[in-house]
From Swiss-Prot:
The gene is SLPI. Induction: Up-regulated in response to bacterial lipopolysaccharide (LPS) in bronchoalveolar fluid (at protein level). Interacts with GRN; interaction protects progranulin from proteolysis. This is Antileukoproteinase. SUPFAM superfamilies: Elafin-like.
């Protein structure tokens, strides 16, 4: 039985992808908590994002959406039961092309006003609820 000359390269590529997936899964399990509620302030310019992933943040800090962009913030504990806001999340169609999209919220209480924390195309975001 003959193997193609591409077979070793295929094995190398699959091995690299497997390691990358396992490493990402381990990292994902390490950062606990959720981003704190966003401050309701106005942004007066476009700030450069300070992070795009929790793993760019030191220690237990998480990469969170803040007033004018993203920054590393101390997480809040989400083990306490949280009141859900009324209404349901809108149905989102499509598929995210990002490997690890950033969640801008984890629970409804992290969203201002009547907004709810809903699954969007890429990660969770605060959205206006749909009236039932």
């Amino acid at each position: 039985m003959k193997f193609s000359g591409l077979f070793p390269f295929l094995l190398l590529a699959l091995g690299t992808l497997a390691l990358w997936a396992v490493e990402g899964a381990e990292n994902e399990a390490l950062k606990a908590g959720a981003c704190p509620p966003r401050k309701s302030a106005q942004c007066f310019g476009n700030e450069k994002p300070r992070c795009s992933s929790d793993w760019q943040c030191p220690h237990k800090k998480k990469c969170c959406l803040d007033t004018c962009g993203t920054e590393c913030l101390d997480p809040v504990n989400i083990t306490n039961p949280v009141k859900k806001k009324p209404g349901t999340c809108p149905v989102i169609h499509g598929q995210c092309l990002m490997l690890k999209p950033l969640n801008h919220c984890e629970t409804d209480d992290q969203c201002i006003g009547a907004l709810k924390c809903c699954k969007a195309m890429c990660g969770k975001v605060c959205l206006s609820p749909v009236k039932a």
